[in-house]
Design a protein with these regions (language model features):
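Conserved glycine-rich Rossmann-like NAD(P)H-binding loop of the short-chain dehydrogenase/reductase
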Residues: 26-41
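Catalytic Tyr-X3-Lys loop
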Residues: 89, 96-115, 158
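C-terminal helical subdomain
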Residues: 163-228
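Rossmann-fold scaffold of SDR-type NAD(P)-dependent oxidoreductases
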Residues: 8, 80-89, 134, 184
Length: 228
């Protein structure tokens, strides 16, 4: 049976490296983000490598759109074996002034969108004993220095979303274990080269993170690991 990975929040860094890593292992790849043009170019680049890849533009902060997305991917590429969640939303940088809409936007993508995708893909994941793989970040950790960094970087909203997402990985993993569905997270401790967070001093190669995701997928343990 053909295996398909749903790559949510595709961009030039980790998610593209994950698409290449899994595609090289025979997976069909569904690329998801909001920019149709960028997605089409990325899918074309993967196809040039001999990987079956298609672009699926969607708003991952809209639950109805996420549910419809999963159905489109299933109809086009077959049952979903892996959900890779790399999507995030900025905004709500200063929680003393952020609007409720800004706070919701971050959580809608980072938490609610992920839960919705898992719910929609659940029959496929159960049938194939699949996996949910989440890109985490160091801002999720409870630490005075990290909290101070989140404030100074204007990333308070992202920090609380990543913290909620980190807990989500744990509880989803506990809930889905009886269905033999693996849930894992790679927490990235630093900036990844070639991404929006690269200010010229990034030290982490996206391919290294992708390789760790592949290791998690094959070993199905541990629940959380770190790169950086």
């Amino acid at each position: 049976m053909t295996k398909t990975i749903l790559v949510c929040g595709h961009g030039p860094g980790i998610s593209d490296a994950v698409a290449r890593q899994f595609g090289a292992q025979g997976f069909s790849v569904a690329l998801v983000a909001r920019s149709a043009d960028k997605l089409a170019a990325a899918a074309e680049a993967l196809c040039a490598l001999g990987i079956t890849a298609k672009a699926f533009p969607a708003d991952l902060g809209d639950p109805a759109a996420v549910t419809e997305l999963v159905a489109r991917v299933r109809d086009s590429l077959g049952p979903i074996t892996v959900v890779h969640w790399n999507a995030y939303a900025g905004g709500a940088g200063d929680l003393t002034t952020a609007s409720p809409a800004e706070l919701r936007a971050s959580l809608d993508v980072g938490v609610i969108g992920l839960v919705t995708a898992v719910q929609a893909a659940l029959p496929d994941l159960q049938a194939q004993q699949g996996a949910v793989l989440v890109t985490g970040g160091g801002l999720s950790f409870y630490d005075d220095k990290i909290d101070a960094l989140a404030v100074s970087w204007g990333a308070m909203g992202l920090a609380i979303t990543k913290a909620a997402q980190h807990k989500l990985v744990g509880v989803l993993g506990a809930r889905l274990a009886k269905d033999n569905i693996y849930v894992g997270e790679v927490v990235v401790l630093g900036s990844v080269k070639g991404t929006a967070f690269d200010a010229g001093n990034a030290t982490i190669e996206a391919s290294r993170v992708a390789a760790r995701f592949w290791e998690l997928y094959e070993a199905r343990t541990p629940r959380v690991t770190q790169v950086g």
